[in-house]
């Protein structure tokens, strides 16, 4: 499958990726991020119930009504890096988290922001997994939940970085929706509309 080919020659461990950041200095909505490495390790090996629990916890520490926090970019970087090593439930939750992180906007006043928040940096971190998301869309065995997340990722990432639009559009058009959730085809059509060349909208 595509994930195996993507990881060919991949020898870096989850701990190696986690070691790229000093989590004791990264701020989240519930304090510093010292507990993130263990949560990522657990998510990578999780079953459905545990993955859901960890997803709720990670979302709670990273996102609020005020927008994303400083921890979003490093957490997104690590989640992308370990996607190929995750159990299917863990991967589904990670993709959902990445979709939410990429879509997060700063909606509160500056004094409510936690740490240094750079939306472009956050989206670039999420976009480092772009080829993986494309592969998931082209993979016939992908779950509906994973497809929903990856469609959302295409929408946000290619909308903000037009250099990704052509490949995103091709991947979306290649998704086979027969036998899938009824809303999937509608979501794809709406996303394709979002990604249409803006010049074609002028009339």
Please give the residue ranges for each predicted region.
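N-terminal "cap/leader" segments of large eukaryotic alpha-helical scaffolds
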Residues: 2-49
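HEAT/HEAT-like alpha-solenoid repeats
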Residues: 37-49, 77-84, 88, 131-142, ...
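HEAT-repeat alpha-solenoid elements in large eukaryotic scaffold proteins
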Residues: 48-59, 105-111
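Residue-level detector of extended alpha-helical repeat arrays and alpha-solenoid scaffolds
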Residues: 51, 72, 91, 146-150, ...
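Hydrophobic residues within the alpha-helices of tandem HEAT/HEAT-like
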Residues: 58-64, 97-106, 154-158
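Short sequence/structural elements of tandem HEAT/ARM alpha-solenoid repeats
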Residues: 70-77, 110-115, 124-128, 163-171
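Eukaryotic alpha-helical solenoid repeat scaffolds
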Residues: 103-138
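Glycine-rich, aromatic-bearing surface loops/beta-hairpins
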Residues: 167-203
